[in-house]
Structure formats: structure tokens, C-alpha cells
């Protein structure tokens, strides 16, 4: 069990994103990245408690990374990334190589301060975006959505507001319909879901599951 594996994607409707100026897009990108960083930190905060409970109450054996035979695992999966790149390219996805390199390289970044500058000078349109996720109101995913809304409202001087709808409320709890609603841009404009859900619509989301 890898306690630091995160496979969530924070996605915004393409038409809405493309309607923004490049400067506005940078603000959205920054707020989205910081919201994801925030979700990751609060999500991982309970790892030790979870591992203790699994070991002490559920008889789960956990082997630390440094005690695992990683080299033999790497040998066993050698070539899988090249194979999947070829599969994607055969389906017309020319960006497959760049995506795989991005998601398989070592991450040397660190958590950033969860704040943004006031960029209300960028002539933002007044809009309300609906954020959805499949987990509950008290989940870290929903908290990530609220953090994004907080950052966007500050950055835009209140022009962009974000409503958070947990448990895919806007599509009666149906995750697949929620993704379709995101693609349509109505009633969902932003969502956070596992790559397993997104990959049903686009196989490139499976890149993050490569060994």
C-alpha cells in the first residue's frame, strides 16, 4: 500500500477555460494547483492513523518502501510505459509521450502557501462555477473545492464564485453523468474525480496508473 499515491484530477470545462484570457488562465491554474496541494496535504494527514488501525485491528501487514524489492518490480514492469504510449498514439493521441514523461518523472516540488494575489484588475466576467466531487461534504475532495473557491474569489475580487456540490448532487449521484455534465459545461463547470472515472471518457487519464 502506497500511502502517498494520489490519482485525483481537478478539471474545468474546456469552453469556459478557453474563454478566459491567458492572464486569467494563469490565475485559474495557480488557484487549482494550490487547491490540489491543499487537498493532498490534508488527505495524507491521516495516513499514520489509518496504517495503525489496519495493522492493529485488521491484521494488515504493511511493508515500508525501503524494505521492498523495488528493483525486481521495476524489471517486471520494464517497457509498460512504452507499450501504453504506443497504444495511445495508435488512437491518435499525439501528446502521449509528453503526458507519460510528465507523470512518471520524480516529483521534486514542495507544498506551496495556499494563497493568491489580488488580480481583480484582469476584467473578470461575473460568473458562478459549480464544483462537484463524488465524495461527501466533509471529505478532503470537497475541502479542496472550497479552497479553490476561496482562492478564486480573492483573486477576482469576488467576480468568480464557486459552489461546492459533494456526492455528485447535480447528477443525482451518478459519477459518469457528472463527467458528461462537466464536458457540456452545464450544470457542472469544475470537478474533482479519480482518474478511473475520467478514463472512461479519455484513456489518457490512465497514464497516472502506470507503474
Regions found by a protein language model. Give the residues of each.
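N-terminal secretory/targeting leader peptides
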Residues: 1-211
Amino acid at each position: 500500500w502506497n500511502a502517498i499515491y494520489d490519482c485525483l484530477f481537478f478539471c474545468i470545462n474546456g469552453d469556459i477555460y478557453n474563454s478566459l484570457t491567458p492572464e486569467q488562465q494563469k490565475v485559474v491554474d495557480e488557484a487549482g494547483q494550490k487547491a490540489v496541494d491543499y487537498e493532498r496535504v490534508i488527505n495524507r494527514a491521516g495516513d499514520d492513523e489509518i496504517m495503525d488501525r489496519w495493522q492493529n485491528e485488521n491484521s494488515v501487514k504493511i511493508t515500508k518502501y525501503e524494505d521492498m524489492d523495488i528493483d525486481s518490480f521495476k524489471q517486471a514492469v520494464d517497457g509498460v510505459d512504452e507499450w501504453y504510449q504506443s497504444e495511445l498514439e495508435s488512437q491518435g493521441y499525439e501528446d502521449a509521450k509528453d503526458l507519460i514523461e510528465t507523470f512518471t518523472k520524480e516529483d521534486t516540488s514542495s507544498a506551496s502557501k495556499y494563497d493568491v494575489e489580488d488580480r481583480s484588475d484582469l476584467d473578470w466576467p461575473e460568473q458562478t462555477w459549480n464544483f462537484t466531487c463524488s465524495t461527501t461534504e466533509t471529505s478532503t475532495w470537497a475541502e479542496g473545492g472550497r479552497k479553490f473557491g476561496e482562492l478564486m474569489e480573492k483573486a477576482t475580487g469576488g467576480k468568480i464564485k464557486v459552489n461546492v456540490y459533494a456526492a455528485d448532487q447535480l447528477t443525482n449521484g451518478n459519477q459518469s453523468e457528472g463527467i458528461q455534465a462537466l464536458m457540456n459545461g452545464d450544470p457542472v463547470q469544475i470537478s474533482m474525480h479519480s482518474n478511473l472515472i475520467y478514463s472512461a471518457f479519455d484513456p489518457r487519464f490512465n497514464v497516472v496508473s502506470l507503474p
